[in-house]
A protein has these predicted regions:
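Conserved beta-strand and immediately adjacent loop positions that scaffold enzyme active sites
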Residues: 1, 13, 78, 178, ...
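N-terminal glycine/serine-rich phosphate-binding loop of ATP-dependent small-molecule kinases
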Residues: 1-91, 347-348, 363-373, 401
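Active-site core segments that coordinate phosphate-bearing ligands/cofactors
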Residues: 4, 108-123, 133-149, 154-172, ...
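Short, basic and Ser/Thr-rich N-terminal targeting/leader segments
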Residues: 9-11, 68, 73-75, 129-131, ...
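Active-site phosphate-binding/coordination module
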Residues: 59-130
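Nucleotide/phosphate-binding loop and acidic/charged catalytic motifs
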Residues: 70, 97, 173-183
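Glycine-rich phosphate-binding loop of ATP-grasp-fold ATP-dependent ligases
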Residues: 90, 125, 180-189
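Non-globular, low-complexity intrinsically disordered regions
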Residues: 210-214
Length: 407
């Protein structure tokens, strides 16, 4: 059995898979946010650690489960900064926290234009969403704190390290860095050199980053983890549209280099856990959808989940508004997805995550790509399953892990 912790921005899950990768147990929690020293909302790191610890020990002491492997996945663009005793020195800053204009200008005046750094690191410039800029900010805004940092860990690697400390109480394990986290829009990784960018060394940021480990089970960035079940079981080329807060079109079969124009439209490269680039395009669609349906529900005095009954033939004024909104959302989504398709010749789109269960979304998306095969993909806990498959040791991987519904 494999135990996986899937730490999402909203939901935190603990999941156990059996040898056939069926979910045999799961639990989830939503942890209320707290605030950092500036009053900005952020993850409650102490509450997260408490939940991880109690859930881990409950599973390990449960006679029903024989856990052979443990892994985790979490959202990216977030650092936990540890002192020499392994204590967190700062809040877990939110990647949506505004970035100071003066510091932004200072960085690019020193290290080169936004366009050149974006091309070298396959990262659109997004301020706090570029986790490397969070480290730069800490160095210049809180130099005393920066000096005390022994290790800065991306959240997936912090969770993995924490899980190891639960197992090894006597000797604390050494933390590591991991390629899926380093390679996801961080401005840290030079894709052509396959090494940290020059600025990371010259600012002495790399001294705060643990050695890169290619050992499995050291945590995965959630977007890279979600791709693994498809790469493991699907034979023909495909694009995966992974939907959640972000809707990310990921094309492992597009080998064209990123262009400046694509970067300006929020294209980027992720890295698989094997270190291969995955050309992708992001759209904040889930976030836009959440805000819009809340507003529509208020305006029409409709239930919060009114949109779940919506179809292409509206039955109410709220549903008519929803259809108009979704038509606009799909127009933006189609532009984003087409950027990831590029000249790759991919003819199949798989949609997973929340929107894969939304009939309006799926039918409008299929209409936007009439010459493509569009499928809603049903896979139990895709991101967590990817993390479990990443520590797969022996034996064949079942071919029926994913159910596909054509549109």
């Amino acid at each position: 059995m494999t135990l996986v912790f899937d730490v999402g921005k909203t939901n935190k899950k603990g999941i156990i898979f059996d040898a056939q990768y069926r979910v045999v147990w799961e639990t989830s929690i939503t942890i209320p946010e707290t605030a950092d020293e500036d009053g900005h909302a952020c993850e409650d790191l102490a509450a997260l650690c408490d939940w991880l610890r109690s859930t881990f020990h409950a599973v390990m002491s449960d006679a029903r489960f024989q856990i052979d492997a443990v892994n985790c996945t979490a959202y990216g663009a977030s650092f936990v900064h540890l002192d020499q005793d392994g204590r967190a020195l700062t809040p877990l800053y939110n990647y949506l926290k505004p970035y100071p204009d003066a510091l932004h200008r200072q960085f690019f005046d020193t290290w080169g234009s936004e366009q050149s750094l974006a091309l070298q690191t396959a990262s659109p410039v997004m301020d706090s969403l570029n986790s490397g800029l969070q480290l730069y900010r800490l160095k210049y805004e809180q130099p005393q704190v920066f000096e005390k940092i022994k290790w800065s860990l991306h959240l997936p690697q912090y969770v993995a390290w924490l899980l190891q400390t639960f197992l090894q109480k006597e000797n604390k394990p050494l933390p590591v860095s991991e390629i899926t986290s380093i390679g996801c829009h961080t401005l840290l990784w030079d894709f052509s050199r396959q090494d940290y960018h020059r600025w990371v060394y010259e600012e002495e940021i790399e001294r705060k980053l643990p050695p890169v480990s290619h050992q499995r089970g050291r945590g995965l960035h959630d977007s890279s983890a979600a791709l693994i079940p498809y790469l493991a079981t699907v034979q023909e080329p495909f694009l995966l549209l992974s939907t959640g807060t972000w809707c990310i079109s990921m094309n492992p079969f597009n080998t064209e280099p990123l262009t400046a124009a694509e970067l300006e439209q929020d294209c980027l490269c992720y890295l698989t856990y094997e270190g291969k680039p995955v050309k992708s395009a992001r759209y904040f669609g889930g976030h836009e959808h959440e805000k819009a349906v809340q507003q529509m529900a208020r305006e029409h005095q409709a239930p919060a989940d009114f949109y779940k009954k919506a179809s292409l033939v509206p039955q109410s004024s709220a549903e008519a508004d929803y259809l108009r909104f979704m038509t606009q959302l799909i127009e933006k989504q189609a532009i984003s997805t087409q950027l990831a398709i590029g000249q790759s010749g991919v003819r199949t789109i798989f949609v997973d995550g929340g929107f894969s269960k939304n009939e309006v979304y799926m039918r409008l998306l299929s209409a936007a790509f009439p010459h493509m095969n569009v499928f809603a993909a049903e896979v139990a806990q895709a991101t967590a399953l990817g993390a479990a498959l990443a520590v797969h040791v022996a034996g064949p991987i079942p071919p029926d892990l994913i159910a596909f519904k054509p549109y």
